[in-house]
Curated annotation (Swiss-Prot):
<keyword id="KW-0687">Ribonucleoprotein</keyword>
<keyword id="KW-0689">Ribosomal protein</keyword>
<dbReference type="InterPro" id="IPR042105">
    <property type="entry name" value="Ribosomal_bL31_sf"/>
</dbReference>
<dbReference type="InterPro" id="IPR002150">
    <property type="entry name" value="Ribosomal_bL31"/>
</dbReference>
<dbReference type="GO" id="GO:0003735">
    <property type="term" value="F:structural constituent of ribosome"/>
</dbReference>
<dbReference type="GO" id="GO:1990904">
    <property type="term" value="C:ribonucleoprotein complex"/>
</dbReference>
<comment type="similarity">
    <text>Belongs to the bacterial ribosomal protein bL31 family. Type B subfamily.</text>
</comment>
<comment type="subunit">
    <text>Part of the 50S ribosomal subunit.</text>
</comment>
<protein>
    <recommendedName>
        <fullName>Large ribosomal subunit protein bL31B</fullName>
    </recommendedName>
</protein>
<feature type="compositionally biased region" description="Basic residues">
    <location>
        <begin position="97"/>
        <end position="108"/>
    </location>
</feature>
<feature type="region of interest" description="Disordered">
    <location>
        <begin position="81"/>
        <end position="108"/>
    </location>
</feature>
<dbReference type="InterPro" id="IPR034704">
    <property type="entry name" value="Ribosomal_bL28/bL31-like_sf"/>
</dbReference>
<dbReference type="Pfam" id="PF01197">
    <property type="entry name" value="Ribosomal_L31"/>
</dbReference>
<dbReference type="GO" id="GO:0005840">
    <property type="term" value="C:ribosome"/>
</dbReference>
<dbReference type="InterPro" id="IPR027493">
    <property type="entry name" value="Ribosomal_bL31_B"/>
</dbReference>
<dbReference type="GO" id="GO:0006412">
    <property type="term" value="P:translation"/>
</dbReference>
């Protein structure tokens, strides 16, 4: 088996950028930035959403805007015109189709 094919698994400090909540978890994430947490120095990874800020875990009803996706949607469709009703074509009378003929039999 080849050696050094997998990245190193170390403890990493994850910081929720919206609440400041910090927790240490094992990961293969590598970073040049480090922070001291509970007396030890860890590589740090900043996350935008964690269990301390996500509405599912906090029970709040606020909307999580993922990098402006909601604003982008509203901007795109707020100026859209409402759909026009489709008008049925005027009926001139019943349309009669001709009878289909059975396919001719092939001779052997």
């Amino acid at each position: 088996m080849k050696k050094n094919t997998h990245p190193e698994y170390n403890k990493v400090l994850f910081v929720d950028s919206s609440t400041g909540y910090k927790f240490v978890c094992g990961s293969t994430y590598q970073s040049d930035k480090t922070e001291v947490y509970e007396g030890q120095e860890y590589p740090v990874c900043y996350v935008s959403v964690s269990s301390s800020s996500h509405p599912f875990f906090t029970g709040s009803k606020r909307l999580v805007d993922a990098e402006g996706r909601v604003d982008k949607f509203l901007k795109r469709y707020s100026n859209a015109k409402p759909a026009q009703p489709v008008q049925a074509p005027a009926e001139e009378g019943p349309v009669v189709k001709g009878k289909k003929k059975a396919p001719a039999k092939k001779k052997k």
